[in-house]
């Protein structure tokens, strides 16, 4: 059996895997254990009571976190005409049509989010095999195919997170950095929970939010007592 590192021993001693933690206690514990030489992200895994095999029960969407994610997001926009100027004014890092598509085909992908106006999808459609596997393909369900590209750029820059369940019905997302205050992380988590509840499929039966677990990049998972989140998130 592999020998536990000192860090992992400390985590095992401090984290009770059988306990549901108060949100404030959980955040304080994660911050105490976030001792990596870089600022760790705080991630969340939400187990949903859905049947991920059924397309009408899949959950996907996007929401802007009130305190952002702590990441600098580079945004590429496929559009033209007045929309191109609006996208640049909103802070887009790359704006174009065929010229931008050519860059991507050459492997130049210095961006984190791709947004497109509907008229640009004829160009973006050629990039499905490149953007799709990377989770970058624009989609109207998450607001990245839209006539209002300027608003989409502002949302992306402000800390919008996109989410979709995996094959096990689990949503994985980030809610900030370990350097955030406990209140900022709590409010970001609550904003995500509100969005997930609004996205509940009509055909989902039984308990919808089964489990909420927080972790840092290099740390262990901590299960959250949902009753300690604000009423609007419950």
Swiss-Prot record:
Cited Pfam families: Ribosomal_L1
Cellular component aspect of the GO annotation: cytosolic large ribosomal subunit
Family matches, as CDD domains: Ribosomal_L1
rRNA processing keyword on record: no
UniProt xrefs under SUPFAM superfamilies: Ribosomal protein L1
Keyword Iron-sulfur: no
UniProt-listed GO biological process terms: regulation of translation; translation
Single annotated GO MF: rRNA binding
Matches recorded under Gene3D superfamilies: 3.30.190.20, 3.40.50.790
NCBIfam families in the cross-refs: rplA_bact
PANTHER family for the chain: 54S RIBOSOMAL PROTEIN L1, MITOCHONDRIAL, LARGE RIBOSOMAL SUBUNIT PROTEIN UL1M
HAMAP family hit by this protein: Ribosomal_uL1_B
Homology family: Belongs to the universal ribosomal protein uL1 family.
Subunit architecture: Part of the 50S ribosomal subunit.
Protein name: Large ribosomal subunit protein uL1
UniProt organism field: Edwardsiella ictaluri (strain 93-146)
Annotated gene: rplA
